[in-house]
């Protein structure tokens, strides 16, 4: 609401309320800002998107305005610092957002406000020491080039929704076009221009993905400005335009009809729909209850015993979340390649082989037997091993016995004299 007050001072309450409505409507995609803003509020990145991102735009606009004070500058610096602790990517996203906010308010700058300009620029470099430290510490680590870069068009649709992105696009375009105030027009247009012309530019996206964001999280360039507030501003301006011009021209009627049609198409895929896996709870677990029970059972099977626990990713990832848990062969198979330089070729190859073994992508054989023993595996979680006779035979030969069958998983255990 504070950012709404800065964008549209005379209609800030309507803009804030419209933003809340769009949060409830635009939740089709798992990556959607609406999902992060409301449904996943217990995550740090959700707090960044819902609070810190609009705060950066609000505080930048307020500080650069004639009524800006040193208190606004201090809070802007605090927002950049807070972003560092909320999410790994917000270390990049917050300076990107700050740059967009600074450029969208450039007409407020004059000879007397040069000091303000350089102060805002300074806040953009707050995360720089941390970024340099991360870069230096990752030297010699596994390359992320194995991941393919998502196409910008795919990023756009996967974040805004495969059906809802048309509605959002119309609102984001309508805002700058219909805004009568020059400052409002710039505040809506420039962050969007940066997103489309630079961050989602098909010519630049491979470079940005590889050297700035890394391919797995390239889609988070969409976190560079508050999309929902900008879309809400566009909606408010469309309604105002239609109300003023509809009786005299056909275009306002057509625009209003298109917006209402796209809204009607979007509503069935709202944020609170049942297939979005919504549960009303405080900091609810973002995991399958069945998988959680399997993880608990696997941990209890090893209680008081030595050795490592081997499980598929969906189970081992949950086991790793427990404050006290057995030593895992892998928390997530994705990390094997990342940590290979630190583990050594033989160790990482054994872990990769065992991951394939419990995931059903690698055949049983002498190499698997050797890996089970070299890594001192005491407990194994498998998908219904009764349908995999070779797997069952191998585990039995290696002195494992099936102790539990839970939700389609079998838990095998053997006693080891000591841990590796």
Q: Can you say where each PLM-predicted feature lies in the sequence?
A:
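Transmembrane-helix signature of polytopic, membrane-embedded enzymes
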Residues: 4-34
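Transmembrane alpha-helical segments
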Residues: 29-30, 86, 90-91, 253-286, ...
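Transmembrane catalytic cores of multi-pass membrane glycosyltransferases
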Residues: 31, 44, 89-193, 200-203
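Hydrophobic/aromatic-rich transmembrane helices and adjacent perimembrane loops
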Residues: 39, 43-52, 210-243
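Membrane-interface transmembrane helices that cradle and orient dolichyl/undecaprenyl
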Residues: 53-74
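Membrane-interface alpha helices of multi-pass inner-membrane proteins
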Residues: 72-89, 99-100, 125
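Signature aromatic-anchored transmembrane alpha helix within multi-pass, membrane-resident enzymes
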Residues: 100, 121-128, 238-271
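Short periplasmic/luminal acceptor-recognition loop of GT-C membrane glycosyltransferases, typified by
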Residues: 292, 296-352, 369-388, 412
């Amino acid at each position: 609401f504070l950012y709404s007050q800065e964008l549209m001072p005379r209609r800030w309450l309507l803009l804030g309320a419209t933003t809340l409505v769009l949060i409830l409507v635009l939740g089709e995609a798992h990556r959607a800002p609406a999902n992060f803003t409301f449904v996943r509020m217990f995550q740090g990145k959700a707090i960044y998107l819902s609070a810190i991102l609009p705060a950066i735009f609000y505080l930048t606009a307020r500080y650069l305005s004639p009524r800006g004070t040193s208190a606004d500058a201090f809070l802007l610096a605090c927002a950049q610092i807070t972003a560092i602790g909320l999410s790994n990517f917000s270390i990049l996203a917050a300076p990107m957002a700050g740059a967009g906010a600074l450029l969208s308010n450039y007409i407020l700058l004059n000879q007397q406000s040069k000091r303000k300009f350089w102060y805002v620029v300074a806040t953009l470099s707050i995360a720089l020491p941390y970024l340099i430290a991360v870069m230096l510490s990752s030297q010699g680590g596994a390359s992320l080039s194995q991941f393919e870069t998502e196409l910008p068009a795919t990023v756009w649709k996967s974040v805004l929704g495969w059906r809802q992105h048309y509605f959002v696009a119309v609102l984001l375009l309508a805002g700058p076009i219909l805004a009568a105030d020059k400052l409002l027009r710039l505040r809506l247009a420039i962050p969007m221009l940066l997103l489309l012309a630079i961050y989602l530019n098909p010519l630049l996206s491979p470079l940005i993905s590889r050297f700035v964001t890394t391919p797995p999280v390239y889609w988070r360039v969409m976190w560079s400005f508050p999309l929902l507030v900008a879309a809400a501003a566009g909606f408010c301006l469309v309604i105002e335009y239609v109300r003023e011009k509809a009786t005299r021209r056909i275009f306002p009627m057509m625009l209003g009809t298109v917006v209402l049609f796209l809204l009607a198409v979007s509503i069935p895929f709202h944020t609170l729909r049942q297939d979005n896996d919504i549960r009303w709870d405080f900091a609810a677990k973002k995991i399958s209850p069945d998988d959680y029970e399997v993880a608990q059972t696997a941990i209890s099977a090893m209680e008081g015993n030595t050795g490592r626990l081997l499980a598929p990713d969906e189970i081992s990832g949950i086991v790793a979340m427990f404050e006290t848990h057995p030593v895992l062969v892998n928390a997530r198979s994705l990390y094997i390649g990342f940590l290979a330089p630190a583990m050594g070729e033989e160790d990482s190859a054994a872990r990769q082989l065992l991951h394939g073994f419990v995931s059903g992508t690698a055949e049983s054989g002498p190499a698997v037997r050797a890996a089970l023993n070299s890594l001192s595996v005491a407990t194994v979680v498998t998908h219904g091993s009764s349908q995999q006779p070779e797997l069952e035979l191998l585990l039995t030969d290696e002195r494992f016995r099936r102790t539990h069958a839970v939700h389609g998983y079998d838990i095998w255990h053997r006693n080891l004299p000591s841990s590796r």
